[in-house]
């Protein structure tokens, strides 16, 4: 067969595959085991019959951008919606990386970071977590100084260790590096949320959203983007929806790589409904955190080393 041109960075890239598991209890994707809250399920069933499936969705998902922006007290242009937050991760590697550039990623962490870096044509440079799975800010800052990456990715809480890195650590890194920073906060809803900026005067429902998150630093720094997802705490993994929040400058550049009508209308409707009813999920999240801690204590009694998790999973050694 004739040899066709294929980008160099793709020639040795394999298809990413995930094993299909036929089981009653499935844990390998960190999904929620909870269905939609009953009142939201009833509302969904009523709207589905007459939903305007024949119409395109909002071009840039403006309907969802606006409600998130209102909560975060930012311009709606500072928000971008995507097919899961991993979609924005890929776009960020494409926009801020590319041939001849380096992207700094944590190890051990989410396997897809390396995939996205490779697809963008960038070179990965790894920074190691400490023995307990936490980020050492000085190590990351030094790596950025030496390697000069065009993008730095931080996973907080980290997957697969579950470690939550304090706002002080995150802010030290953000304020010290010269490249854009991606904060992947897919599991932040499960973190303790024990840290709040001391002078934050937002109402309680808005404080809960940003507790422990780099979202609370928006407006103070312009070099980072926070990614969040509806797949984990909110149980919409099957609909694929996430969002990014950052400075107007970074988000406008990121938006250039996003196609029009990129998130389907029903996903946007459901994500907006869930977002506007976040309070319904607090009890579930609390239960998951409590059961996680019980299981961690039990595993420690059995002699396992359990990484200190602030996510909805545990890593044992």
What are these regions (language model features)?
Residues 1-55, 148:
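N-terminal "arm"/small-domain region of PLP-dependent enzymes with the aminotransferase-like
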Residues 28, 246, 315-317:
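Conserved PLP-binding active-site segment of the aspartate aminotransferase-like
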Residues 37, 223-300, 304-307:
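PLP-dependent aminotransferase class I/II
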Residues 62-102:
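Phosphate-binding glycine-rich loop
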Residues 95-154:
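PLP-dependent aminotransferase-like
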Residues 126-128, 150-157, 182-185, 308-310:
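Short beta-strands and strand-loop turn motifs
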Residues 135-147, 160-181, 185-231:
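Active-site pre-lysine segment of PLP-dependent enzymes
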